From Swiss-Prot:
The lineage of its organism: Eukaryota, Viridiplantae, Streptophyta, Embryophyta, Tracheophyta. In plastids the minimal PEP RNA polymerase catalytic core is composed of four subunits: alpha, beta, beta', and beta''. When a (nuclear-encoded) sigma factor is associated with the core the holoenzyme is formed, which can initiate transcription. The gene is rpoC2. This is DNA-directed RNA polymerase subunit beta''. One of its GO terms (molecular function) is zinc ion binding. It comes from Coffea arabica (Arabian coffee). It catalyses: RNA(n) + a ribonucleoside 5'-triphosphate = RNA(n+1) + diphosphate. Binds 1 Zn(2+) ion per subunit. InterPro entries: DNA-dir_RpoC2_beta_pp (IPR012756), RNA_pol_beta''_euk (IPR050254), RNA_pol_Rpb1_3_sf (IPR042102), RNA_pol_Rpb1_4 (IPR007083), RNA_pol_Rpb1_5 (IPR007081), Rpb1_funnel_sf (IPR038120).
């Protein structure tokens, strides 16, 4: 007793709480010291103690013990706030759906994780003896995840397909779930009834297959004499010491281990914990160990390769059935594994990205040359740094240096003020190089009816040349322009042309009708019958064909001269495919820069002799009416008819004879056409002054002689400016028409600069007011010389046009009006006298005789601060057909500022005289504008009706005078939308001008230069185009030059996502056709704009057609053609994005099964190719050797074995299940032990395609001394079970009839070596540790020893051959295959 007391006094007293792991350690040490029986005795005492204490404590668990974390409220609120901002950005078109989904998942995942981390400290501080806390954190029952669901928040769930549901469950189970949350959480339940039942059966089946594959593996020999081993590196940062110890303990060394000259361990010595600790302290070089992979026995295993038995710490006994033990050890824990985990979705690669936060308030500075602007995967603007970046933060007197690692995102700008703890950078999680990613498709559906537009070039997917699948080359917006489509064939209307205004009551937008529009060129008033829904027929005459109204058909946005109908045959053709470069304001009409309007065929293909463009020289433009006369007497009349052949939308120009007109004259006069009933306040033949009142609402603009003629249509009143002479002699003036008389230079009244150069002319006209006498009216004449200035050099700047050899542009001038024909202009319109045609022509080459057509595309370049658009015409079709507007039936549009005026004034605004009735009539909200779309076959057209409700109007702007009527209508009605149409301009002429500028990339940097290559007929020069604007935090736009088209979007270009209602004065540059994102401030104290396209710009207001932007990133697929009508719910874009396949997608049991059955993963990661190329360079050198096949197959097999073991271990470890590597290795050895004979070398032994054990193939090769070609294959466990040496075991597993029939046909012999065969036949099982005693060693045994020695000699020779490869091999494997995330033994040695 005293002895015992003395012993107790020497014992150390440990005052520590003991948890599960400490308990395990204690038990293992007790077994090592005292053996099994004594240990169990001690453990019984511990158990009794535990029960006593637990009863005394009487821990009970009630619902009150679940304490919710106090910080949960604001964490959830914060996440909801972020989600709201995200939703807004998505609405504004700054992020697309995939980015939104990613970010919202990350926001909620992070919130859930923070709550989970808060849990343990919260319990510790508030209630350390909380039963829940004691129970879960001691490891007795329950784990962190379950407690997190009880007191934290349940977080994100996945649906049955493993996709994330982006609606998080915010409640925990203590607070209770709402109905929606309950339904969602039923998806992800892993302890549900369904889940458990399925899991048990799955795990059972897995165990059955595993045992099947390894049932015959028994320990039969002591040593197989192998010389190979697998090398394990000593623990470094990548591989925790715990796993290193687990890997080594219980193994047998394959090679001696030296520390310097001293041998610290010998070959075939088994490794205990002491030896491992010695290795760790000595940092021994890679240690070569024997594993089941290296064993050379074909159908069993030797003691030394297996090592110690896990049950009793000694070398395994002979006759132990290690295969079955291995199968059960892996299969049994399968019931503990989950089928799915909680955090599935794999959207984030490994948790949350790490953030770098600012240490203090201050200004941030970094070197901008080292960073590169980009978009993060959430669509935020950021800088990507490629190398280590040092960021300094300067507060009042302290400098903080922050180092940002490479490949990180910098989220702030240079010189920006940051606050303490603000996130300034995001470090990308270091993903392993071979992480598999899967491609996911996400469809975005349209929210509303309308037309689709995009703002960049779009490539056709090459396989569908005529399909409607387009790929986006760069980040851009897609816009859905709102408008209600009508389709049906109930009513046949022949009347409505494009751009006509109409009453929406005449056709119901709710019902979808289609009108087959017969195209007629007759310009009389149509009568048409609209069937009302009551069945009555009414005669209706539409009110839009007044004489003085220009019918603007097609998509022409320029005013064409309003001539009378007789000579309007040239101009009245429907110009469907015209696009116009400049659009000037009325005030600057006199000195504007020349505008070229270009005509493009519908399909975008020019034929030979097509008229490429018209050019109206402003020098030949007049504002007043008048008469044209041609110059000198020796001239003939002008070309009588220009041959304008029109077919399939292409205009060709074939002049039969073409005249040079030297000069012609324009005699101005003022003409008013009045209704017959109007009262005229001036007399015929009287002379009036300027601004005399003629009728109630018309005043004269020029002074002179008045002539009044009554005609059928009404009264025609002309005012001739000029002087009256009473001539003495009659003969000088002819009776019929006027005469042009030249004046000597310098004389006369017209004393301008031009008079020195030109002769002045006057026009003398004889007027006979009565029978008594007559007088002569001398009228001033404006002389026009046809100058040579109109060549290509003036049309295009000389440096921008270089013609190819075979594409020519010819300039053709012609005068629009016949000799002496009167020209009438109504009100303010200007009249064009001379038109210049550019005719496109090219030589017919013998080689390229096939090219009868030349496709056209647009190029945008920028010179001297102006954006210009050029048409590029190629004779060769490009492989990627640019369909800028190729498939656009509704015409091409392009519009640009030539810099003369920034705000384009709508040209229609002053055509009509205002009257109250008319304005009120057009403010009728039920009126819409028709917008015709031809369908593909052009058989009938469908209409889109733009209602007033689809447009919103900004304005009126301050400081602009406008007519009283409009002011009144604005005063009377509060709604600013009412006064949309104060003029009858074409609302909805959007498509022709939609594409006139491309969006800048959504980057926010103003120093970036993008080089666009201009290709107008092969030009060599390149231009740098600055397309970036940046906006500071106040919403001001800084842009490099003011004439540019700015994308006004405060959120895109803004670094701080600032408060949405905050706006300062912005620079207003609005151009026709521009797309505007929501929330843009146009002027100070104005309401925000709705998103849409500017279709109508006036002096004082803008009309915007509502549109919805969708952001699309490169590589997205756009469905539908440009300008096509989409209905609500149509697929608009398809995004293809990668999400990393972290271990999350298939987890637990399915994952293990996937590996063991060697099922392939759907898609291969992007960076796999590069790595394989790298391997090939190294491998080719090895494959040159005579042992090439052997080595390459070995290499493949060893690598695959190692990685399979690691993958399976990873799944089990992640669930906290510990399995010894040996068990997994035995199974993996069976999967990888077969090779497939290939067809390369026909050998005499095996037929191609036969599956043979690797060792057997090697032995055959040595015996026959000829190379056998084979390649390594991975068999799944099912296939491996069906490819054994015993047909009885195969037949008892699967496909019994097939296996037995084949065996009978082949005459297979079953040697009954395994367990299963003997069980089936009822024989004695050839296993068991006493088995060796029954079999007496015979003479053959001695022979076997001799053979072994010979073999060892052979191995020695082989080692010499392979010796020079060995170093190379080791370094190669260590470099290439070392996967940082997975520890393991790397490489293999031929030692």
């Amino acid at each position: 007793m005293e002895v015992l007391m003395a012993e107790r006094a020497n014992l150390v007293f440990h005052n520590k709480s003991i948890d599960g792991t400490a308990m395990k350690r204690l038990i293992s040490r007790l077994i090592d010291h005292f053996g099994m029986a004594y240990t169990s005795h001690i453990l019984d005492q511990v158990k009794t103690l535990g029960f006593k204490q637990a009863t005394a404590t009487s821990i009970s668990l009630g619902i009150d013990d679940l304490l919710t974390i106090p910080s949960k409220g604001w964490l959830v609120q914060d996440a909801e706030q972020q989600s709201l901002i995200l939703e807004k950005h998505h609405h504004y078109g700054n992020v697309h759906a995939v980015e939104k989904l990613r970010q919202s998942i990350e926001i909620w995942y992070a919130t859930s994780e923070y709550l989970r981390q808060e849990m343990n400290p919260n319990f510790r501080m508030t209630d350390p003896f909380n039963p829940v806390h004691i129970m879960s954190f001691s490891g007795a029952r329950g784990n962190v995840s379950q407690v997190h669901q009880l007191v934290g928040m349940r977080g994100l769930m996945s649906d049955p397909q493993g996709q994330m549901i982006d609606l998080p469950i915010q409640s925990n189970l203590r607070e209770g779930l709402s109905l929606t949350e309950y339904i969602i959480s039923c998806y992800g339940a892993r302890k549900g009834v369904v889940d458990t039942a399925v899991r048990t059966s799955d795990a059972g089946y897995l165990t059955r297959r595993l045992v099947e594959v390894v049932q015959h593996i028994v320990v039969r020999r002591t040593d197989c004499g192998t010389v190979r081993g697998i090398s394990v590196s000593p623990p470094n940062g990548m591989m925790p010491e715990k796993f290193f110890i687990q890997t080594l303990v219980g193994r047998v060394l394959a090679d001696d281990i030296y520390m310097g000259p001293r041998c610290i361990a010998t070959r075939n010595q088994d490794i205990g914990i002491e030896l491992v600790n010695r290795f760790i302290t000595f940092r021994a070089q890679p240690i070569s160990i024997r594993t089941p992979f290296t064993c050379r026995s074909t159908s069993w295993i030797c003691r030394l390769c297996y090592g110690r038995s896990p049950t009793h710490g000694d070398l395994v006994e002979l006759g132990e059935a290690v295969g079955i033990i291995a199968g059960q050890s892996i299969g049994e824990p399968g019931t503990q594994l989950t089928l799915r985990t909680f955090h599935t979705g794999g959207v984030f690669a490994g948790g949350i990205a790490e953030h770098v936060r600012a240490p203090s308030n201050g200004k941030i500075k970094f070197n901008e040359d080292l960073v590169h602007p980009t978009r993060t995967r959430h669509g935020h603007p950021a800088f990507l740094c490629f190398i280590d970046l040092y960021v300094t933060i300067k507060s009042e007197n302290i400098l903080h240096n922050v180092n940002i690692p490479p490949k990180s995102f910098l989220l702030v700008q240079n010189d920006q003020y940051v606050e303490a703890e603000q996130v300034i950078a995001e470090i990308r999680a270091g993903t392993s190089t071979l992480s598999f990613k899967e491609k996911v498709r996400k469809h975005i559906y349209s929210d509303s009816d309308g037309e689709i537009h995009w703002s960049t070039d779009v490539y056709h997917a090459p396989q569908f040349t005529y399909g409607n699948v387009h790929l986006l080359p760069k980040t851009s917006h897609l816009w859905i322009l709102l408008g209600g489509p009508c389709r049906s064939s109930l009513v046949s209307l022949s009347l409505h042309k494009d751009q006509d205004q109409m009453n929406t009551h005449s056709l119901s937008v709710k019902r979808r009708y289609t009108y087959k529009l017969s195209v007629t060129n007759d310009r009389v008033r149509y009568k048409f019958f609209s069937s009302d829904f009551y069945g009555k027929k009414k005669n209706r005459i539409p009110d839009y064909l007044d004489l003085n109204r220009i019918i603007c058909t097609g998509y022409c946005n320029r005013i064409y001269p309003a001539i009378l109908h007789e000579n309007s045959d040239l101009l009245s053709k429907r110009r469907r495919n015209r696009f116009i470069m400049p659009l000037q304001s009325i005030q600057e009409r006199e000195n504007e820069s020349p505008g070229i309007s270009i005509e493009i065929p519908i399909n975008g293909i020019f034929r030979r002799n097509s008229i490429l463009s018209y050019f109206d020289d402003p020098r030949y433009r007049r504002k007043s009416s008048g008469i044209t006369k041609y110059g000198t007497i020796e001239m003939h009349s002008l070309v009588k008819k220009e041959d304008l052949i029109e077919y399939r939308g292409v205009k060709e120009f074939r002049p039969k004879y073409q005249m040079k007109v030297d000069r012609f004259f324009f005699i101005p006069e003022e003409v008013h056409i009045l209704p017959g009933s109007s009262s005229i306040m001036v007399q015929n033949n009287s002379i009036i002054g300027i601004d005399t009142q003629i009728t109630l609402n018309i005043r004269s603009r020029v002074g002179g002689l008045v002539r009044v003629e009554r005609k059928k249509k009404g009264i025609e009143l002309k005012i001739f400016s000029g002087d009256i002479h009473f001539p003495g002699e009659t003969d000088k003036i002819s009776r019929h028409s006027g005469v042009l008389i030249p004046l000597p230079p310098g004389t006369g009244k017209i004393n301008s600069k031009e008079s020195k150069k030109l002769k002045n002319w006057i026009y003398v006209q004889r007027i006979t007011p009565s029978k008594k006498g007559y007088f002569a009216l001398v009228r001033p004449v404006i002389t026009y010389e046809k100058r040579d200035g109109l060549n290509l050099a003036t049309l295009f700047p000389p440096d921008l046009l270089q013609e190819r050899d075979n594409v020519r542009l010819q300039v053709v001038n012609y005068i629009l009006y016949g000799n002496g024909k009167p020209i009438r202009g109504i009100s303010d319109t200007s009249i064009q006298l001379v038109r210049t045609c550019l005719v496109l022509n090219w030589d017919q080459d013998k080689k390229s005789s096939s090219s009868e057509e030349a496709p056209a595309s647009f190029v945008e370049i920028r010179t001297n601060g102006l954006i210009r658009h050029f048409l590029r015409i190629d004779l060769v079709k490009s492989p990627i057909s640019y369909i800028v507007k190729r498939n656009d039936p509704s015409g091409s549009g392009l519009l640009s500022d030539n810099g003369s005026d920034c705000t384009n004034i709508n040209p229609f605004s002053s055509i009509y005289s205002y009257s109250k009735a008319r304005i009120q009539q057009f403010l009728n909200p039920n009126q819409g504008t028709i917008h015709t779309l031809l369908n593909k076959n052009r058989e009938f057209q469908s209409l889109i009706i733009l209602l007033s409700s689809n447009c919103s109007r900004m304005g009126p702007f301050a400081g602009v005078k406008y007519h009283n009527v409009i002011k009144e209508s604005i005063k009377n009605k509060k709604d600013p939308r009412i006064s949309i149409r104060n003029s009858l301009g074409p609302l909805g002429s959007a498509p022709p001008i939609a594409n006139f500028f491309s969006f800048s990339h959504l980057l926010t940097h103003n120093q970036i230069l993008v080089t666009n290559y201009l290709q107008l007929d092969n030009i060599k020069e390149t231009f740098q185009v600055i397309k970036y604007y940046s906006m500071d935090e106040n919403g001001k736009i800084y842009n490099p030059d003011p004439c540019n088209n700015i994308i006004l979007n405060p959120l895109n270009l803004n670094w701080y996502f600032r408060h949405h209602n905050y706006c300062e004065e912005t620079s207003t540059i609005i151009s026709l056709g521009q797309f505007i994102c929501e929330n843009v401030c146009i002027a100070k104290n104005r309401p925000h704009l709705k998103p849409g396209q500017v279709i109508f710009v006036q002096v004082d207001s803008v009309v915007i057609r509502s549109a919805k932007p969708y952001l699309a990133t490169p590589g997205a697929t756009v469905h539908g053609h440009y300008g096509e009508t989409l209905y609500e719910g149509d697929i608009l874009v398809t995004f293809i994005y990668e999400k990393s396949r972290s271990g999350d997608i298939t987890q637990g049991l399915p994952k293990v099964e996937q590996i063991l059955e060697v099922r392939s993963i759907d898609s291969i990661s992007m960076n796999l190719q590069k790595r394989i190329e790298g391997w090939n360079k190294c491998i080719t050198r090895i494959l040159g050797t005579p042992w090439g096949f052997l080595i390459s197959a070995e290499l493949t097999i060893v690598q695959s074995q190692i990685s399979l073991v690691n993958k399976i271990q990873k799944v089990y470890r992640s669930q906290g299940v510990q399995i010894h590597n040996k068990h997994i290795e035995i199974i993996v050895r069976q999967i990888t032990s077969k090779v497939l004979i290939s067809e390369d070398g026909m050998s005499n032994v095996f037929s191609p395609g036969e599956l043979i054990g690797l060792l057997r193939a090697e032995r055959m090769g040595r015996a026959l001394e000829e190379a056998i070609c084979y390649r390594a294959v991975l068999l799944g466990i099912t296939r491996a079970s069906l490819n054994t040496q015993s047909f009885i075991s195969e037949a008892s597993f699967q496909e019994t009839a097939r296996v037995l029939a084949k065996a009978a046909l082949r005459g297979r012999i079953d040697w009954l070596k395994g367990l299963k065969e003997n069980v089936v036949l009822g024989g004695m099982i050839p296993v068991g540790t006493g088995f060796k005693g029954l079999v007496k060693p015979s003479k053959q045994h001695n022979k076997a020893l001799l053979e072994t020695k010979k073999k060892n000699l052979f191995e020695g020779e082989m080692r010499d051959i392979l010796f020079h490869h060995r170093n190379f091999f080791d370094s190669f494997l260590l470099k290439k295959f070392h996967d940082p995330s997975e520890q393991s033994f790397i490489g293999f040695n031929d030692s």
